[in-house]
């Protein structure tokens, strides 16, 4: 871990648990190296990591000097190596990561090396949270039944993880039914200060989920990366990035009565998206921090991917210490955190000088009002009072012209009719909000008030409560609010991501028939962080993000075609109208309930048994041995082809000639569009493959659970039912046109035809290509389809990195140019000029030849951003690079 003391900065710090060594940032100040006192706190953490890890090979003295002299106005475009202290994984991205490690071990043996060289060198925690689905709901049996179904569907994956637990050191699995990875990280895993070999240093991490940034609320630097990049970190590689710009977000005032942390984060997301912070750090500062609970901070940090930032950081301060105490962390750890951060100049107080920032924004918390976001993007905020007119305005965008049909829900227990805007899913879900006691207690109090007035959930609404940790269940029970939530159909359905990631399960059949029969624009209201098309449920077109109390309110109303500020939710038994304002809890009522229902003993009790898991987990045994025994008949875990027949040395970089366009897409194409996580259709290429292997459609599970099998995932790439390939106007789904035949076919089948003829492929895209989840299979699947370059107006940070990590060339149109302006429609043949002299961000010429002989020449910017990424690209990917290095060592 610690490799040297080049600056003479090593010192000793006394704590209540004894002395620790550390690397003094103040030594740099004493030596006249930089103005550290006014650096952003997030940059100070990166600086400490460089100072501690100087070895003049991976990390040099120049790296320390460059960060210490960070220029706020124009940070130098210099590559910074960062060695995170640990890695967190969730199972949808974690299983394929461990599959890759197993495949690397197999490849190492084929290359004559020691397979044990492939082993995590930093602590890795995998939390199983992505597999539970909402099959049963509104029942006291829902939790147990959904858990049983989860194990039935995923037993093979879980057996594989059991093998991984035994085969790899530094690797821990947190079993199903414990919670959501980011909430578990916040409440349990994060120490804020780590100690290794007697050296104390700031906790830091990367995670295979974009919402890893939630931990920034605790003062821990961490962000989401693709699985392939996380695997490289596990194997001892640093993260390389350009020196970041840091945007300061100044908060003042306090949240007003009636507004929640959810309203705040939707406001901040809208502001920061407009400010364009992709690839930048955001750091919150100002007097408003003193009135924000740590849970509120975590909510703001969680949605950094939605506003586009790498991190959304809050410095460690007195509230951090109080949170550590409230969540049952050991007193000696809290003492170490306080002493270490104060000694290092990393501890914020009201009197701390405001840091220097590249740019700043400001928000008075008093200006935050009740809000929602949707129907397609989290940055599209809508004031609650404007929901009705905004809904009317959105309807034509879903193809509705004229009057909305009214359809009977036939076969349901209660006779009902629904129309456009019917809320068919109301889900209290996602670590973004279930980690925040104020909004969870608020939802419970609103439910209690609603039940007291005789209100009920609309019968067509599929309602669910999926807390991010078991502690939530305990404090709701202690506050006496669980029974009211149960009465409205918000029984706990599982401890995992559920609806937020598309695991909403099927709609009740009568509701599904009504929606499809009437071609209704049905709606979902969820307390999640993403609402992209096709994500929540394939039958739900309009998706709105809202606070947990508003989720309960809309479950009662049963429609978004309503103005909750002026129209009643329903009537009480006496026929009196009941309005939202009548049942909305006051801030004081929420604060009192939080104070009386929560204590550190809850966290100690629940997390004291976190590693044991439910009985279903304890019964599973994995195979033995350092090498995984691949089963050719498995439909869940297969050895991926990435390292099979890999040459010892890489070939020189060459141009791409005679390429065809496989897919052409517009702006904001998400990783969900590229590699969906949800259900597998029986008539899709992946569905047909599974049926050919003897898997019945009811046993397909979902794409996310099949990520250990490249055969399924390659067929599922660009298979989202809401994908709009502009090469096939008027269609949705995974279809394209094969050239020169002109045949309309599935994207997978077209790719295989091109492969058979040795034709390389490209993808054309608009702005924000690859936005959304950190999903490395969006890059892996792209590569396995034969795509060698993606030409886009702009890229989201993680997906660009993942493409490079898989050896796919990201090219960006020059400012003012685009697919449209150049007249590219996907029928062209592309030649991309490239050779072994490639350097970061160089100009790359592209020639597109049209069928009529016209030739379009244009220049792009190569989005291989750093020198080490050139090395990765030359080797065919980051893991290929690491494997070759380890094989030679």
For every predicted segment, state its role.
Residues 572-587, 799-872:
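Acidic, glycine-rich flexible loop/linker segments
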Residues 55-254, 261-266, 370-373, 387, ...:
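Long, structured ligand/cofactor-binding scaffold of large enzymes
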Residues 196-338, 347-348, 441, 447-459, ...:
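Mobile "lid/hinge" segments at catalytic clefts and subdomain interfaces of large enzymes
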Residues 83, 101-156, 283-284, 289-400, ...:
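Terminal amphipathic helices with adjacent charged low-complexity linkers/tails
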Residues 2-149, 292-302, 306-330, 632-675, ...:
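N-terminal amphipathic, basic-rich helices that act as targeting or association modules
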Residues 285-292, 529, 751-752, 756-796:
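Extracellular/luminal Protease-associated
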Residues 460-505, 713, 773, 779, ...:
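Extended C-terminal subregions enriched in glycine
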């Amino acid at each position: 871990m610690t490799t040297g003391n080049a600056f003479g900065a090593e010192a000793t710090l006394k704590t209540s648990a004894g002395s620790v060594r550390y690397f003094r940032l103040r030594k740099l100040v004493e030596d006249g190296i930089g103005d550290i006192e006014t650096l952003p706190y997030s940059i100070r953490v990166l600086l400490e990591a460089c100072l501690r890890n100087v070895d003049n090979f991976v990390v040099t003295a120049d790296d320390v000097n460059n960060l210490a002299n960070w220029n706020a106005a124009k940070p130098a475009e210099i590559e910074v190596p960062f060695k995170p202290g640990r890695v967190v994984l969730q199972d949808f991205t974690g299983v394929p990561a461990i599959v890759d490690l197993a495949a690397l071990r197999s490849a190492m043996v084929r290359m004559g090396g020691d397979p044990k060289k492939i082993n995590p060198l930093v602590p890795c925690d995998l939390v199983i949270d992505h597999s539970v689905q909402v099959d049963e709901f509104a029942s006291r049996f829902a939790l147990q039944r959904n858990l049983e179904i989860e194990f039935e569907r995923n037993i093979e994956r879980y057996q594989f993880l059991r093998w991984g637990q035994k085969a790899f050191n530094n690797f821990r699995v947190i079993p199903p039914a414990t919670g959501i990875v980011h909430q578990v990280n916040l409440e349990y895993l994060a120490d804020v200060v780590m100690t290794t070999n007697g050296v104390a240093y700031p906790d830091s991490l990367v995670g295979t989920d974009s919402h890893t940034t939630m931990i920034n609320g605790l003062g821990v630097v961490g962000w989401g990366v693709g699985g392939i990049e996380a695997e490289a970190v596990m194997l001892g590689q640093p993260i390389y990035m350009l020196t970041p710009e840091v945007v300061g977000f100044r908060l003042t005032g306090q949240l007003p009565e009636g507004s929640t942390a959810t309203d705040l984060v939707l406001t901040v997301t809208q502001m920061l998206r407009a400010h364009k912070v992709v690839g930048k750090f955001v750091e919150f500062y100002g007097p408003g921090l003193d009135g924000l609970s740590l849970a509120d901070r975590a909510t703001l940090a969680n949605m950094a991917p939605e506003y586009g930032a790498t991190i959304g950081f809050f410095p460690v301060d007195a509230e951090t210490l109080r949170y550590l105490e409230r969540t049952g962390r050991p007193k000696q750890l809290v003492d170490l955190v306080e002493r270490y951060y104060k000694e290092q100049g990393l501890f914020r107080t009201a009197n701390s000088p405001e840091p220097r920032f590249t740019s700043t924004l400001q928000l008075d918390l008093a200006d935050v009002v009740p809000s929602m976001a949707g129907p397609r993007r989290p940055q599209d905020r809508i004031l609650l009072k404007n929901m009705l007119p905004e809904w009317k305005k959105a309807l034509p965008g879903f193809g509705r012209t004229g009057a909305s049909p009214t359809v009977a829900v036939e076969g349901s227990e209660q006779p009902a009719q629904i129309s456009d805007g019917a809320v068919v899913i109301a889900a209290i879900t996602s670590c973004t909000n279930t980690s925040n006691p104020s909004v969870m207690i608020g939802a419970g109090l609103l439910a209690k008030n609603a039940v007291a007035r005789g209100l009920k959930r609309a019968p067509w609404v599929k309602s669910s409560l999926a807390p991010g940790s078991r502690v939530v269940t305990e404090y709701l029970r202690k506050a006496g609010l669980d029974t009211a939530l149960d009465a409205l159909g918000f029984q706990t359905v599982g401890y995992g991501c559920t609806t937020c990631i598309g695991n909403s399960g099927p709609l009740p059949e009568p509701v599904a028939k009504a929606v499809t029969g009437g071609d209704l624009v049905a709606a979902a209201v969820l307390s999640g962080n993403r609402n992209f098309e096709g994500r929540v449920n394939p039958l739900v077109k309009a998706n709105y993000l809202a606070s947990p109390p508003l989720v309960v309110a809309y479950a009662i109303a049963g429609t978004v075609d309503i103005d909750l500020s002026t129209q009643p939710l329903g009537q009480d038994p006496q026929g009196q109208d009941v309005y939202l304002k009548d049942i909305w809890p006051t801030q004081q009522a929420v604060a009192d309930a939080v104070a009386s229902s929560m204590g550190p003993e809850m966290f100690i009790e629940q997390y004291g048994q976190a590693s044991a898991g439910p009985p279903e987990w304890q019964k599973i045994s994995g195979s033995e041995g350092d090498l995984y025994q691949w089963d050719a008949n498995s439909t869940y875990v297969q050895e991926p082809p990435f390292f099979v027949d890999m040459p010892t040395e890489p070939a020189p970089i060459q141009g791409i000639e005679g390429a065809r366009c496989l897919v052409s897409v517009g702006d904001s194409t998400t990783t969900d569009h590229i590699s969906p996580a949800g259900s597998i259709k029986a008539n899709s290429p992946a569905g047909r493959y599974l049926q050919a292997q003897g898997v019945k459609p009811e046993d397909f599970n979902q794409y996310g659970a099949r990520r250990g099998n490249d055969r399924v995932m390659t067929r599922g790439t660009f298979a989202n039912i809401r994908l709009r390939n502009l090469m096939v106007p008027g269609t949705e789904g995974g279809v394209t046109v094969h050239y020169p035949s002109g045949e309309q076919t599935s994207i997978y089948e077209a790719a295989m035809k091109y492969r058979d003829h040795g034709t390389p492929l490209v993808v054309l895209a608009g702005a924000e290509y690859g936005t959304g989840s950190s999903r490395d299979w969006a890059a892996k699947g792209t590569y396995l389809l034969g795509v060698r370059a993606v030409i886009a107006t702009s890229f989201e940070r993680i997906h660009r990195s993942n493409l490079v990590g898989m050896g796919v060339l990201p090219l960006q149109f020059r400012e003012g140019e685009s697919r449209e302006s150049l007249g590219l429609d996907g029928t062209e043949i592309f030649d991309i000029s490239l050779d072994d002299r490639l350097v970061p961000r160089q100009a790359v010429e592209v020639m597109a030849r049209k069928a009529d002989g016209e030739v379009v020449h244009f220049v792009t910017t190569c989005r291989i951003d750093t020198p080490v990424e050139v090395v990765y690209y030359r080797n065919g990917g980051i893991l290929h690079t690491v494997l070759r290095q380890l094989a030679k060592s």
